[in-house]
Amino acid sequence: MKSLKGTKTAENLMKAFAGESQARNRYTFYSNTAKKEGYVQISNIFLETAENERMHAKRFFKFLSEGLDDEAVEINGASYPTTLGDTKKNLIAAAKGENEEWTDLYPSFAKTAEDEGFKGVAAAFRLIAAVEKEHEKRYNALLKNIEENKVFEKDEVKFWKCIKCGYIFEGKTAPKVCPACLHPQAYFEILSENY
């Protein structure tokens, strides 16, 4: 890889690295809140997304470490969210951050990288932007479930799975308590067969 020294791409990569790193930590905090509020599936999704963000940060950092000789990168004009509330507020903040990444930040970072001759960096920004779009979609769907009181109740009959013991229940509403292992409703989610 050619040198990133003195490029706008180096600054953008560092902004992206910092943003992804902070998102990872925020999502870990949000996961704890969701679990405390009885949303175990949402907690797990925050943790899964935190791991996705860690991998994005790693990809951006690898470009930096390959394109610079152990040099620090100063970033100006970047701001990072500080939201920490209940699960609903956290989902709103998370969706907003993901939206900004895929609609504004990463497309502009990709264009700059391409203009500066860093095609691999540009491609990474575009591919990761596509992931961020899916993150936003998922956060908005989870938010809608909370707002419509549909986390543990659906309009049609579903198969609900206890993620602690594997018990499967058929109905419109997840049981208040798992009859097999006695864990609370918080541990039920819609059965997913994606194999």
Curated annotation (Swiss-Prot):
Keywords: Electron transport, Iron, Metal-binding, NAD, Oxidoreductase, Peroxidase, Transport. InterPro entries: Ferritin-like, Ferritin-like_diiron, Ferritin-like_SF, Rr_diiron-bd_dom, Rubredoxin-like_dom, Rubrerythrin, RUBY_RBDX. Rubredoxin (Rd) increases the NADH consumption rate by serving as an intermediary electron-transfer shuttle between NROR and RubY. Its cofactor is Fe(3+). It comes from the Bacteria. It catalyses: H2O2 + NADH + H(+) = NAD(+) + 2 H2O. Binds 3 Fe(3+) ions per subunit. It is an enzyme of class 1 (oxidoreductase). The keyword Iron applies. Induction: Various environmental stress conditions, e.g. oxidative stress (exposure to air or H(2)O(2)) and other stress factors such as salt, increased pH, high concentration of solvents or cold shock, do not lead to increased transcript levels of this gene. Is not repressed by PerR. Residues 3-150 form the Ferritin-like diiron domain. One of its GO terms (molecular function) is iron ion binding. Fe(3+) 1 binds at E20, E53, E101, E132. PROSITE patterns: FERRITIN_LIKE, RUBREDOXIN_LIKE. Fe(3+) 2 binds at E53, E98, E132, H135. Its EC number is 1.11.1.1. CDD domains: rubredoxin_SM (cd00729), Rubrerythrin (cd01041). Residues 157-191 form the Rubredoxin-like domain. Gene3D superfamilies: 1.20.1260.10, 2.20.28.10. Pfam families: Rubrerythrin (PF02915), RUBY_RBDX (PF21349). Fe(3+) 3 binds at C162, C165, C178, C181. Functions as the terminal component of an NADH peroxidase (NADH:H(2)O(2) oxidoreductase) when using NADH:rubredoxin oxidoreductase (NROR) as the electron transport intermediary from NADH to RubY. Homodimer. This is Rubrerythrin-1. The gene is rbr1.
